[in-house]
């Protein structure tokens, strides 16, 4: 089973792809989709959509895992992140890819065993769990791999 994990954002959207074969979970790839600040929001969302669809077509995931929105102090940021999430939900839905949402607490708990772990702890565990040479960069990609890991350990495949 191939899983794409997403750390939603509109400036930087992280993705991570894992393969689960019985009880073995392995790293396929990871990266980010970035947009420029001076580009209108509707064009940024269109760009995110197009790049994400390319990932879906290239890697053919069986499931998509995405981090749910958590509390944002800045309402405008929350709205824009929600819009970027909507683009991911739409692209997945159009291709009949099942989508699973996880809270930041669930992701941290599944990866580290502690739901209040900090970002560095999560990144170190992602490196260790996936047997990578280095912590995935940028942070958004590491977070996306953590989201994918969360689904990989919870789903029966």
Swiss-Prot record:
Residue positions binding Mg(2+) 1: 7, 140
EC number annotated for this UniProt entry: 3.1.21.10
Q: Which residues are involved in binding Mg(2+) 2?
A: 67
Q: Spell out the Pfam families in the cross-references.
A: RuvC
**Reactions catalysed:** Endonucleolytic cleavage at a junction such as a reciprocal single-stranded crossover between two homologous DNA duplexes (Holliday junction)
Q: Give the residues annotated as active site.
A: 7, 67, 140
Q: Which CDD domains match?
A: RuvC
Molecular function per GO: crossover junction DNA endonuclease activity; DNA binding; magnesium ion binding
* Assigned keywords, A-Z: Cytoplasm, DNA damage, DNA recombination, DNA repair, DNA-binding, Endonuclease, Hydrolase, Magnesium, Metal-binding, Nuclease
Q: What is its main location?
A: cytoplasm
Q: Which GO terms describe its biological process?
A: DNA recombination; DNA repair
Q: Which prosthetic group or cofactor does it need?
A: Mg(2+)
A single Gene Ontology CC annotation of this entry is: Holliday junction resolvase complex
The subcellular localization recorded is:
Cytoplasm
How and how many cofactors are bound, per the record note?
Answer: Binds 2 Mg(2+) ion per subunit.
Q: Which PANTHER family match?
A: CROSSOVER JUNCTION ENDODEOXYRIBONUCLEASE RUVC
Quaternary structure (record): Homodimer which binds Holliday junction (HJ) DNA. The HJ becomes 2-fold symmetrical on binding to RuvC with unstacked arms; it has a different conformation from HJ DNA in complex with RuvA. In the full resolvosome a probable DNA-RuvA(4)-RuvB(12)-RuvC(2) complex forms which resolves the HJ.
Its function, per the record, reads: The RuvA-RuvB-RuvC complex processes Holliday junction (HJ) DNA during genetic recombination and DNA repair. Endonuclease that resolves HJ intermediates. Cleaves cruciform DNA by making single-stranded nicks across the HJ at symmetrical positions within the homologous arms, yielding a 5'-phosphate and a 3'-hydroxyl group; requires a central core of homology in the junction. The consensus cleavage sequence is 5'-(A/T)TT(C/G)-3'. Cleavage occurs on the 3'-side of the TT dinucleotide at the point of strand exchange.
Family named by the database record = Belongs to the RuvC family.
**Which HAMAP family does the entry mention?**
RuvC
NCBIfam families annotated for this entry? PRK00039.2-1, ruvC
What name appears for this protein in its UniProt entry? Crossover junction endodeoxyribonuclease RuvC
- State the organism of origin: Thermosipho africanus (strain TCF52B)
């Amino acid at each position: 089973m191939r899983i794409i994990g997403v750390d939603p954002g509109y400036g930087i959207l992280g993705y991570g792809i894992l393969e689960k074969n019985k009880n073995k979970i392995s790293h396929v790839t990871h990266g980010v989709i970035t947009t420029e600040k001076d580009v209108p929001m509707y064009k940024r969302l269109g760009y995110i959509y197009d790049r994400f669809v390319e990932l879906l077509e290239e890697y053919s995931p069986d499931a998509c895992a995405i981090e749910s929105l958590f509390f944002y102090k800045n309402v405008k940021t929350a709205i824009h992140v929600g819009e970027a999430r909507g683009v991911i939900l739409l692209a997945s839905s159009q291709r009949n890819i099942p989508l699973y949402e996880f809270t930041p607490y669930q992701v941290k708990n599944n990866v580290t065993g502690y739901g209040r772990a900090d970002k560095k702890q999560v990144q170190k565990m992602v490196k260790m769990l996936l047997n990578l040479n280095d912590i995935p960069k940028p942070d958004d990609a590491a977070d996306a791999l953590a989201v994918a890991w969360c689904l990989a350990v919870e789903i029966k495949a």
